[in-house]
Amino acid sequence: MKVLELGWLHKINRTRRLYSLRRYYHVETLFNGTLVTGGRDQETTGFAWWSGNARLINLSGKLLGAHVAHAGLIVFWAGAMNLFEVAHFIPEKPMYEQGLILLPHLATLGYGVGPGGEVIDTFPYFVSGVVHLISSAVLGFGGIYHSILGPETLEESFPFFGYVWKDKNKMTTILGIHLILLGLGSWLLVLKASYFGGVYDTWAPGGGDVRLITDATISPATIFGYLLKSPFGGDGWIVSVDNMEDIIGGHIWIGTLEIFGGIWHITTKPWPWARRAFVWSGEAYLSYSLAAISLMGFIACCMSWFNNTAYPSEFYGPTGPEASQSQAFTFLVRDQRLGANVASAQGPTGLGKYLMRSPTGEIIFGGETMRFWDFRGPWLEPLRGPNGLDLNKLKNDIQPWQERRAAEYMTHAPLGSLNSVGGVATEINAVNFVSPRSWLATSHFVLGFFFFIGHFWHAGRARAAAAGFEKGIDRDDEPVLSLKPLD
């Protein structure tokens, strides 16, 4: 019994050493012991200076300051970059030739553009930049105030804004507030599109125009049908949306569901199964957020690369399939004028040189672009009939604006690499074009990927902490502690 007792004592002592409060002091080490700020040093919080907001996990007032300041930085970038793009903008050139990523978004919302996506007024873009800059100043002052002067914790003075991470009811209330704000943001787009000036619709007759969306799709079968589609091939899940009515209708549904979902989460308490299923800690919520924003990043990647309705080609440049199809169309127009019989001409493989049959029997463009046979674009659709491309329309109905747009898109394929070596390999050195679609798709894919890895990292740590076996490195025996200080 004595031996057993001593054995347990040894085990308890070792457990105290490994699993004491020091298990929250992870492997970060201050490089300079003088960097101590108001009780937010490593010894107090368990996190070194470069762990940033982790030092503020239990200081709700200071964490509020960090978040408000962060929002200020984001809005400042938006305003500054907006004004930078306005200052460099050349109205005579397409937006996608000028490396712009913010002005195309404003143009898509219907600001400053007219028929065909032509920019007729840059003043709204200037106003947008100034409004964001002023807003960022307000947020910046708020961030500084709450970081330096405001209360360290909010629970005592402002209980409505205070919280404890383990308080499941408070956490779902905060979730509900966020959902309502997101829902209101979604409805702002609906109101802009339906009542306040409209949005740019690339499918408007004659090559696109700004118009009011007065008949948004509210059929649940249509809207939720996108979610039930396959993400592969020509199905394309929600990325396949190809009209503004469905886009605005989708925002009506999303906005409404988020508002009602927010009210639900504010007025109810989490059910027992949810209390058991989730880890309820600050790091767990971080991991959930990272997973969600990772998914948004991957969806934005596919949307900006493939979709030419939400991301009109007039502003973002053609999609890959669109540039390929426009090349086939351009040479069909040229050779038809030179006397070629585009319906029967054969290419070197014996297949149709200009036109051929798709797997489903439709008439499609021939040649290498056959792989993009199911492409749909506003400059091409008027030339289709009940069975694919209409021969009679190709011979008699091609409009000058379609020729011009196809020629422009043909020479602006989204092929540039991100080190700004643009164009195809055979292009002359003077050509250096990188499509905004290349930038937006690759950047969102990379960011989505790293957020995904961050989700795994923080989810693993949160689950380990909840299970009680997150111990890190035993700092007492760490070799570096026996070495001489660098200074």
From Swiss-Prot:
Location of the protein in the cell: Plastid, Chloroplast thylakoid membrane
Nucleotide-binding is among the record's keywords: no
GO process annotations (BP): photosynthetic electron transport in photosystem II
Gene Ontology annotations for the cellular component aspect, listed alphabetically: chloroplast thylakoid membrane; photosystem II
Sites where the protein binds [CaMn4O5] cluster: E381
Modified residues (Phosphothreonine): T29
Modified residues (N-acetylthreonine): T29
Entry-linked InterPro entries: PS_antenna-like, PS_II_antenna-like_sf, PSII_PsbC, PSII_PsbC_sf
Membrane protein topology class: Multi-pass membrane protein
Alphabetical UniProt keywords: Acetylation, Chlorophyll, Chloroplast, Chromophore, Manganese, Membrane, Metal-binding, Phosphoprotein, Photosynthesis, Photosystem II, Plastid, Thylakoid, Transmembrane, Transmembrane helix
Propeptide: 1-28
Coiled-coil blocks: none
GO molecular function, one term: chlorophyll binding
Pfam families per record: PSII
SUPFAM superfamilies associated with the record: Photosystem II antenna protein-like (SSF161077)
Co-factor remark: Binds multiple chlorophylls and provides some of the ligands for the Ca-4Mn-5O cluster of the oxygen-evolving complex. It may also provide a ligand for a Cl- that is required for oxygen evolution. PSII binds additional chlorophylls, carotenoids and specific lipids.
Family according to the record: Belongs to the PsbB/PsbC family. PsbC subfamily.
Subunit structure, interactors included: PSII is composed of 1 copy each of membrane proteins PsbA, PsbB, PsbC, PsbD, PsbE, PsbF, PsbH, PsbI, PsbJ, PsbK, PsbL, PsbM, PsbT, PsbY, PsbZ, Psb30/Ycf12, at least 3 peripheral proteins of the oxygen-evolving complex and a large number of cofactors. It forms dimeric complexes.
HAMAP family: PSII_PsbC_CP43 (MF_01496)
Role summary: One of the components of the core complex of photosystem II (PSII). It binds chlorophyll and helps catalyze the primary light-induced photochemical processes of PSII. PSII is a light-driven water:plastoquinone oxidoreductase, using light energy to abstract electrons from H(2)O, generating O(2) and a proton gradient subsequently used for ATP formation.
Protein name as catalogued: Photosystem II CP43 reaction center protein
Gene: psbC
